[in-house]
Regions:
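Alpha-helical transmembrane segments of multi-pass membrane proteins predominantly involved
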Residues: 1-416, 432
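Active-site-proximal region of nucleotide-activated glycan assembly enzymes
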Residues: 2, 413-442, 446-453
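Small/polar loops that bind or transfer phosphate-bearing groups
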Residues: 59, 171, 421-422, 466
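Conserved donor-binding/catalytic core segment of Leloir-type glycosyltransferases
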Residues: 135, 465-466
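A short helix/loop element that forms part of the nucleotide-sugar donor recognition site in Leloir-type
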Residues: 453-465
Length: 466
């Protein structure tokens, strides 16, 4: 296993464990044995997905996770949950078809079932229409997993209708794994055909199209979130917007930007999981998840209100929390990678991301205003003094993690950077054989020529020290 797989296997297990701790699960689920068995199947599929570069195994592992998540979405057997599960299944089936067809086209072009083999085939000559069509279909399929616009239409209904534990697994663990798969495809298999989304020097490739997808996701997610009267649906559109932020970093096609995106997806998962836990607790007590249901939360349950403050301000990117560190790292890395040529680079996309982040403050603060400023109705003004341990863990651990990662981001950023360091190490070994670094790319035991940038000076210094 490479460092990236090891890190994200631990991340998926941690997020899955926190999802199990969500307080309402036992009340919503009549058959907990079957429910937690499906959760284990879903986690198994996600764990297998993080560590593979084999196209067929990747599809099988993703579908193992997806089929389990479809069932988990409707497990509470309410009308709303049934609708959520059906929509999730239908959209998921279409996305799986796109993904499988795309993988088959890529295999037909490269005659290899591994991403390393795909990269070798692409480096041998110009990409064929088969490879281009295959990559487009793969991005569409993974866009569904990440809830990127316009492939996000399943998300609001699933977030609102599914049991809280299921939603947490979809929102946190599944999104993290989807990003890992996308990073592997773009940074290993299709790195040599990235093109450029720079404003002053746009080149054909996947980067400009990913930049457009990022812009659409950010605008759709943030604008539609403004009109929501359900906090769960608000978090669903927030997920769409945050997928856009992640794609801003990937559009730069740099190791440091990809590392920042991987850091942020973990932070996003913790913040969203914690916000869902607080929302589920409020929904259990008040009967609905409207922003008005949060009125007076600071008086009813001060610790939940403070935790909600941490979660939503982290999602909004307010310092000194981990959400700010993640967004700053992504946007600054995207700017640094894309302006090396002397053009304005991704200034247009990063500027749009900053504007959309400012807009997101409105709907996050509207919920916090209810929790901290508004008075609760007398019928709801009951102190929460008997919270179970699982409730404390589901809300408290993510809140503490966001504060710690905000103050000490190197705890997670440094291990993630080892993925980039390993890539640079491979290039360095090939340079020792007399092959120019800017014309080489190595993955595992394979070496081939491609047009890639030389390792960053900081990475070269780390390699020299090692």
């Amino acid at each position: 296993l490479d460092p990236l797989a090891r890190i994200f296997k631990a991340v998926v297990l941690g997020l899955g464990l926190l999802a199990i701790f969500l307080p309402p699960a036992r009340r919503e689920i009549a058959q907990p044995g079957e429910f937690y068995a499906l959760m284990l199947f879903a986690l198994t599929g996600l764990l297998l997905t993080t560590g593979t570069n084999h196209l067929l195994f990747l599809f099988v592992a993703l579908e193992l996770a997806s089929l389990s998540l479809y069932l988990l979405a409707g497990f509470s057997r309410t009308a709303r949950a049934a609708e959520a599960s059906l929509k999730y299944f239908l959209f998921g089936g279409v996305s799986a078809a796109f993904l499988l067809f795309g993988l088959s086209l890529i295999y037909g072009f490269s005659h290899s079932a591994t991403l390393q083999g795909v990269a070798v085939a692409l480096a041998a000559g110009p990409p064929s229409p088969l490879a281009i069509a295959g990559l487009v279909m793969v991005v569409v399929g993974l866009g569904f997993k990440l809830a990127a616009a316009p492939f996000h239409y399943w998300a609001p209904d699933v977030y609102q209708g599914a049991p809280a534990t299921s939603v947490a697994l979809v929102a946190a663990a599944s999104k993290a794994v989807g990003l890992v798969v996308l990073v592997r495809f773009l940074m290993i298999g299709f790195h040599s055909v990235s093109g450029s989304a720079d404003w002053g020097g746009m080149l054909a490739g996947w980067s400009p199209w990913l930049a457009v997808l990022a812009a659409v996701s950010m605008v759709f997610g943030n604008v539609l979130a403004l009109a929501q009267t359900s906090v769960r649906r608000l978090l669903a559109y927030s997920a769409v917007a945050n997928t856009g932020y992640l794609m801003v970093a990937l559009s730069a096609n740099g190791v440091s930007a990809a590392g920042a995106a991987l850091f942020y997806v973990v932070v996003y998962g913790l913040a969203t999981l914690g916000a869902l836990a607080v929302t589920a607790a409020v929904e259990r007590d008040c009967g609905n998840d409207s922003p008005a249901a949060f009125a007076g939360l600071i008086h009813r349950s001060p610790w939940q209100a403070v935790a909600l403050l941490v979660f939503l301000t982290s999602l909004a990117g307010i310092p000194p929390l981990a959400g700010f560190v993640g967004k700053f790292a992504m946007f600054s890395a995207a700017m640094a990678e894309s302006t090396k040529s002397g053009t304005p680079g991704l200034t247009w996309l990063v500027g749009l991301a900053a504007i959309m982040s400012a807009i997101s403050l409105y709907y996050y603060l509207s919920v916090l205003k209810q929790a901290f400023v508004k008075e609760a109705p007398e019928a709801d003004a009951v102190a929460d003094s008997t919270a179970p341990l699982s409730h404390l863990l589901a809300i408290g651990l993510p809140a503490v993690a966001l504060v710690v990662l905000g103050l000490f981001p190197a705890l997670l950023l440094d291990p993630i950077d080892r993925f980039g360091v390993q890539t640079a190490l491979d290039r360095d070994r090939l340079r020792a054989l007399g092959v120019p670094a800017e014309k080489t790319f190595v993955t595992g035991n394979l070496k081939f020529e491609a047009t890639l940038p030389a390792p960053l000076p900081a990475l070269e210094e780390m390699i020299r020290i090692i």
